[in-house]
Amino acid sequence: TPSLENGSYDVSNVDDVVSDILKYGWDKDLSNKSLVIGCTTNPGDCDFFQDRLSETGINVFYNPEFIAQGSIIKDLQNADMVLLGGDGKHKGNLVNIYKKIQYGYKEPSIHLMSTKAAEITKIAVNCFLTTKISYANMIGQVLAQSNLYDEIETVLSSIGSDSRIGHKYMNFGFGFGGPCFPR
């Protein structure tokens, strides 16, 4: 999801889809339909879209992806968790779909909550990961400034060996980036 100048998420593409549904969908029975939003949104955006679609009977759900550029398919097939935010009557159907496809090779944990709680959870996960990347780079810089270049990997691996911390994202080098992590 691209950012606006103020740092918030640009959800104009989703807004365009909602506008198209309102423009072209009135002659159809949409009461058994759901709109599942997968991009990162600002807390409250999904509620706003649900309000706009309230007269159509469409249920809005929030199901953000946890993917990285360069490993999108692998990340989707091996998801650790699925967030599903929404209060609509079709939530159970969506959960059953996820259980059937299981995203690939392992069954992710599925977390059901309101759309706003899911929006906040997605942002919180992204913030935690960027903090972890920054922390690993800070430790690497301290070691480099102490002329301990050859021990950076050993130190970060040792820190990551603590199960409360883990090895993922405990690497010295490039910082975070891409469309999801600059905020």
Q: Where do the protein language model's features map onto the residues?
A:
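Structural/interface elements that position substrates and couple domains in central-metabolism enzymes
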Residues: 1-183
